[in-house]
Amino acid sequence: MSESYKVISDNRQARFQYEILEVFEAGLALTGTEVKSIRAGKVNLRDGFAQIRNEEAFLLNVHVSPHTNAGQFFNHDPRRTRKLLMHRQEIRKLIGKTEQKGLTLVPLKLYLQRGWIKVTIGLARGKKLHDKRESIKKRQDKRDMERALKRGAE
């Protein structure tokens, strides 16, 4: 991802709820109305997750709003299962890792790169409640230190 890209949707909640172990980039197999809606930014990654079936990766439960100018007949189902376009060796690597207890695949970011819509998938382990509290405390302490430094500089 060294080239420039435009972030369309970011799943910030995933980084709070999960500990991200590894990150993968994948393309998406989309219909025309889905592409138009995603380019307009009408997508929600919050409840989404990825699954691997028959050595193919799929993105489930990601909400892409129906396109406003398309008729009902031509529009897509907002929560349909979408195929992820990944290299075969990446999928095989993920099969072994997702079979481990407690690991899942979550979408982290949806972006536009050179005209192609791509998604960043994270191999993640769910955080416990005390881990979430700890990360909140660290973030609050960091803010307090920055405020104190700012006041000292004035």
Swiss-Prot record:
Residues 132-154 are annotated as: Disordered. Required for rescue of stalled ribosomes mediated by trans-translation. Binds to transfer-messenger RNA (tmRNA), required for stable association of tmRNA with ribosomes. tmRNA and SmpB together mimic tRNA shape, replacing the anticodon stem-loop with SmpB. tmRNA is encoded by the ssrA gene; the 2 termini fold to resemble tRNA(Ala) and it encodes a 'tag peptide', a short internal open reading frame. During trans-translation Ala-aminoacylated tmRNA acts like a tRNA, entering the A-site of stalled ribosomes, displacing the stalled mRNA. Pfam families: SmpB. It is found in: Cytoplasm. This is SsrA-binding protein. One of its GO terms (cellular component) is cytosol. The keyword RNA-binding applies. GO terms for molecular function: RNA binding. One of its GO terms (biological process) is trans-translation. It comes from Acaryochloris marina (strain MBIC 11017). Belongs to the SmpB family. The keyword Cytoplasm applies. Coiled coil: none annotated. Keywords: Cytoplasm, RNA-binding.
